[in-house]
Amino acid sequence: QEDMGIGPAMMGGSGAPSDWVLAGREVMHGPDQHGAGAAMVTMNPQYRLNDPGVGLQDADHRVLVYEDLKARRPYPDQREPEREIELHLTGNMGRYMWSFDGDKFTEVDGPIRFNHGERLRLIMVNDTMMDHPIHLHGMWMHLENGFGELRPRKHTITVKPGEMLSAQIHADAPGYWFFHCHLLYHMHAGMARVVHVA
């Protein structure tokens, strides 16, 4: 495995705002660096909500970025998250493996568990060199992009290479819900999980 080596020079944009909720956070990698399903890891993940994406940094027109999005009114549930879940988007292109935390869908023991009614923070770290649009069925993700109570609600959030971002989730929908990369060949190769709200 290798460190992706992505630094601010590759990121584009002016960097994270001073009140970024993940500023100074240590990224968590297991002792096996997420196993064979991860060809590389991000040792220094970056704030990229202000990055328009590959090929658009020098566009002569304005490009909408996640840092621009704002809800029209506050979501009623403004509780602080009760807990955090850190999830790594992992891949090994040489072995055509895509996964969460180094484990393909067919290799996990059980679902990701949300407690019904809880508010939690989902932290996603992209340890690959590709964008991953991550879709949670059944519930909204409230992207933490600096707008506080006006966090935008999203069902799908694209996580850029080397990026770490977070979203708050109100686990208000009991049952089993699919959680996956929306690039279907990544999903079929294993970048998918089930969320169980109970």
Report each predicted region and the residues it spans.
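Copper-binding active sites and cupredoxin-like electron-transfer domains
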Residues: 1-198
